[in-house]
């Protein structure tokens, strides 16, 4: 009887999740036409066509792109060549394939695809939460945190950079955690693939594979150092292949271009001003607390409180382990596999925030450049 009841509850919970996701998908498809064009969309579209022109030239494809966009420069001469086009390039190709020449059709199509990418990442986020917590209710709550945040929900339709980055980051976190736990070739490929895609969208994403390999080596399991070197080598080779493959600007193998992209991200050369606490401030001279304030005022208060409590608890566990490191097996920073993943997620959040504060990176339009940190914050809040 217990087995029957368990099986019944299991299928009921799966049906509930399926219905919830189906309703969410239909709702998004129903309202995607209600959103206008955001500031960056036209720029990103142009970026995609510049790279598409370069790809066509390399492949010997003769298609007149002036039917879609005029005055396309060569990629080598383009001012924004250092920005990844993982999303923009396929979207430009789809415009050509579908022969979308009407501007309204173009941007409505982009909004629909933008939402669908976020929807797929939402499904992945649910599976990630269920993998970590083994609880359908907690996983559903975490999913609600993600998709019902007003700013995230709205921008999931018209933000082709930050939302796409966050979506790719969710997949990358999931598969890198699976790689750390199982260390199989399948997850080497999937983890390196989505890490490369994330890095190709914004170069800051490169810290995730570095962090993953750091945790691989410092995990005091029964795997020998030779095995870990082999796994790391496979991961790095796969990452390098995917990284170059999905970023046409990198096809010539010039590693210096990666440094150029880093410099662009570290201090984006935008001379605009930002209204902050009643004063107009240069975006490149914003105070260190800019991100934290914007996160607070744009996140539902109950979400914010849960995330802060989880962040405090996670940081406390890490500090306690650091103090008592000599008492832990193999001198690890974690006592068990669950704590390893918790501290891994904590560092996923801490590293980019610390980098932005230290390098005084240019921020504007709220905290959208750091949206990719929202999913790991939700995970920390639920722990």
Segments from the language model and where they lie:
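Specific aromatic-rich, kink-prone transmembrane helix
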Residues: 124-127, 164-181, 190-195, 349, ...
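Transmembrane signal-anchor helices characteristic of membrane glycosylation enzymes that use polyprenol
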Residues: 13-41, 49-59, 63, 67-74, ...
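Short helix- or helix-capping micro-motifs
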Residues: 142-147, 174, 195, 199
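Transmembrane-helix motifs of polytopic, lipid-linked glycan transferases
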Residues: 108, 112-133, 171-175, 316-319, ...
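Transmembrane-helix signature of polytopic, membrane-embedded enzymes
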Residues: 18, 123-148, 181, 185-186, ...
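Transmembrane-helix signature of polytopic, lipid-linked glycan biosynthesis machinery
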Residues: 28-33, 152-153, 157, 197-199, ...
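Transmembrane-lumen/periplasm boundary regions of multi-pass, lipid-linked membrane glycan transferases
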Residues: 52-57, 80-89, 98-102, 197-199, ...
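Short acidic/glycine- and proline-prone juxtamembrane loop motifs at membrane-interface regions
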Residues: 38, 151, 157-164
């Amino acid at each position: 009887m217990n087995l029957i009841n368990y099986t019944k509850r299991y299928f009921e919970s799966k049906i509930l999740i399926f219905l919830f996701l189906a309703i969410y998908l239909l709702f998004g498809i129903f309202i995607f036409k209600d959103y206008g064009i955001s500031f960056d969309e036209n720029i990103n579209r142009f970026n995609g066509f510049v790279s598409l022109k370069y790809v066509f030239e390399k492949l010997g494809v003769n298609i007149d792109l002036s039917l879609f966009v005029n005055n396309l420069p060569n990629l080598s001469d383009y001012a924004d060549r250092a920005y990844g086009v993982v999303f923009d390039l396929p979207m430009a190709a789809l415009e050509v394939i579908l022969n979308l020449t009407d501007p309204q059709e173009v941007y409505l199509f982009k909004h629909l695809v933008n939402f669908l990418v976020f929807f797929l990442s939402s499904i992945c986020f649910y599976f990630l939460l269920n993998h970590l917590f083994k609880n359908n209710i907690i996983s559903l709550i975490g999913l609600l945190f993600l998709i019902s945040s007003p700013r995230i929900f709205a921008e999931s339709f018209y933000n082709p950079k930050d939302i796409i980055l966050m979506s790719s980051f969710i997949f990358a976190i999931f598969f890198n955690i699976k790689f750390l736990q199982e260390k199989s070739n399948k997850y080497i490929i999937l983890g390196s693939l989505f890490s490369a895609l994330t890095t190709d969208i914004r170069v800051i994403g490169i810290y995730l594979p570095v962090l993953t390999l750091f945790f691989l080596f410092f995990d005091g399991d029964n795997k020998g150092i030779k095995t870990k070197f082999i796994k790391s080598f496979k991961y790095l080779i796969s990452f390098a292949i995917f990284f170059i493959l999905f970023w046409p600007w990198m096809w010539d193998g010039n590693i210096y271009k990666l440094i150029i992209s880093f410099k662009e991200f570290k201090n984006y050369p935008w001379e605009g001003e930002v209204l902050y606490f009643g004063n107009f401030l240069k975006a490149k001279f914003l105070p260190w607390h800019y991100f934290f304030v914007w996160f607070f005022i744009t996140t539902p208060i109950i979400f914010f409180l849960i995330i802060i409590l989880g962040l405090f608890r996670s940081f406390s566990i890490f500090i306690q382990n650091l103090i008592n490191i000599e008492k832990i097996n193999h001198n690890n920073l974690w006592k068990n596999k669950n704590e390893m993943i918790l501290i891994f997620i904590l560092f996923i959040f801490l590293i980019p925030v610390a980098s932005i504060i230290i390098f005084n990176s240019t921020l504007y339009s709220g905290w959208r450049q750091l949206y990719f940190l929202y999913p790991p914050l939700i995970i920390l809040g639920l722990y």
